[in-house]
Amino acid sequence: MAGSPMVELFAGELRRARGAAGLSQEALAQQISYSAALVAAVEQGRRLPRPEFTTRCDEALGTDGLLSRIREKLSREVLLPWFREWVRIEQEATALRSYQPLVVPGLLQTEEYARALHVGASPLAGEAMEQQVTARIERQAVLHQASPPQLVAVVDEYVLRRPVGGADVMRAQLRHLAELSRLHHVHLHVVPAAVGSYPGLNGAFVVATTPDGDDVAYLDNQLQGHVVSHGPDVLSLVRTWESVRAEALSARQSTELIEEAAQAWT
């Protein structure tokens, strides 16, 4: 990401605004409660700015949200190329139907859980990994916007039992799921282990309903993900979704199971 146009734009505008305010890197760092080393790294394009850092810089430098607007575009650039189209669809969707047999869906992950997944399964490391973790967490803003999509997420019970990141991470993650289930537009369902074999075990997928009423889907694999818009393929996934949903517990029963599983992670 270093050297990309958006990184250079952000770094340049931060340097310009700081200079216009008559502040040294050390003085700005003191005002925003971050280290001077981090300010220097961001201005040199070696570190990507986090949301809170950016907001504090906007406030301290009186830039009227300019840095935050640049960072919003920068966060999209950080996304893996094949995922950018789906994030755009996700942000505009009126409804999302998600199924995950292995891990907590990205929109519902805590930062610690997302980081643990990357540590255990991603080829990325260091700053590159942190960029992806940050991008994943920022995507979740779609659930808290003025007109959020309705999200119906189904997970396999094994997702609640898989020790991603250890007991503390899992306990916090499952408590987070229980809290999200109280939002009026978020509905969580769990397929109990007793069900045995069912269609969803063939793999995870998400179906998004666009503002014009069309359905579009997303599939992931070991190499990359891709958007599915071919009518018959989308219809097949919708039918699989209906089969999966039919095997799941009710929202209330699922929340009870999630809370029970959270208490078991001690």
Annotate each predicted stretch with a short phrase.
Residues A2, D58, W86, D215-V216, ...:
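Bulky hydrophobic/aromatic packing residues
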Residues V39, V78-L80, L201-N202:
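Short secondary-structure transition/capping segments
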Residues M1-L74:
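Basic, Lys/Arg-rich alpha-helical nucleic-acid-recognition elements, primarily the DNA-binding modules
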Residues S68-Y99:
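Short, charged recognition helix plus adjacent turn
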Residues E26, E43, E90-E92, E157, ...:
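Acidic-residue sensor for enzyme active/binding pockets
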Residues A95, Y99-T266:
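Hydrophobic protein-protein interaction segments
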Residues M6, Q31-S35, W82-R84, V154-E157:
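A short alpha-helix capping/helix-coil boundary motif
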Residues R15, Y34, R88-Q91, Y99-Q100, ...:
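Short, functionally important structural connectors and interaction interfaces within domains
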